[in-house]
């Protein structure tokens, strides 16, 4: 199973593509899609959409997992991230590939085993699970890989419980 994880954002959207076979993960690709602050708002969203569409077409994942937004105290930041998230969900939905959404708590629980884990703990586990030489940077990329791992683990649990939705 090929899983694309997306950590949505406006300035930076992290993505990670992993292959999950049996109970082992291997990384196929990971990076960040960035937009330039001087660009028009709509053009930045278009860049994000076009880049995600290219990646989806290149890897043809079996599932796309996206991190849900958590409440942000800065309402303007939350709104701009929300726009980026909407574009990511649209690109995924347009592809016809199943979309799975996970909260940060679910991702931490799945990757680290503790829902209140610190970001550094999640990053270390991503590095270890995927046998990477270093923690992926920026943080958004490690987060995207973590949400992909979360879906792989959820898929395995769903299969064990006889739930074919995953």
Curated annotation (Swiss-Prot):
UniProt-listed GO biological process terms: DNA recombination; DNA repair
InterPro entries, alphabetized: RNaseH-like_sf (IPR012337), RNaseH_sf (IPR036397), X-over_junc_endoDNase_Mg_BS (IPR020563), X-over_junc_endoDNase_RuvC (IPR002176)
Subcellular location: Cytoplasm
GO CC annotations, alphabetized: cytoplasm; Holliday junction resolvase complex
Presence of keyword Phosphoprotein: no
Top EC group: hydrolase
Sequence positions that bind Mg(2+) 1: 7, 140
Keywords: Cytoplasm, DNA damage, DNA recombination, DNA repair, DNA-binding, Endonuclease, Hydrolase, Magnesium, Metal-binding, Nuclease
Reaction(s) the record says it catalyses: Endonucleolytic cleavage at a junction such as a reciprocal single-stranded crossover between two homologous DNA duplexes (Holliday junction)
Family in the record: Belongs to the RuvC family.
Reported function: The RuvA-RuvB-RuvC complex processes Holliday junction (HJ) DNA during genetic recombination and DNA repair. Endonuclease that resolves HJ intermediates. Cleaves cruciform DNA by making single-stranded nicks across the HJ at symmetrical positions within the homologous arms, yielding a 5'-phosphate and a 3'-hydroxyl group; requires a central core of homology in the junction. The consensus cleavage sequence is 5'-(A/T)TT(C/G)-3'. Cleavage occurs on the 3'-side of the TT dinucleotide at the point of strand exchange.
PANTHER family: CROSSOVER JUNCTION ENDODEOXYRIBONUCLEASE RUVC
Subunit structure: Homodimer which binds Holliday junction (HJ) DNA. The HJ becomes 2-fold symmetrical on binding to RuvC with unstacked arms; it has a different conformation from HJ DNA in complex with RuvA. In the full resolvosome a probable DNA-RuvA(4)-RuvB(12)-RuvC(2) complex forms which resolves the HJ.
The protein's name: Crossover junction endodeoxyribonuclease RuvC
Organism this protein belongs to: Ruminiclostridium cellulolyticum (strain ATCC 35319 / DSM 5812 / JCM 6584 / H10)
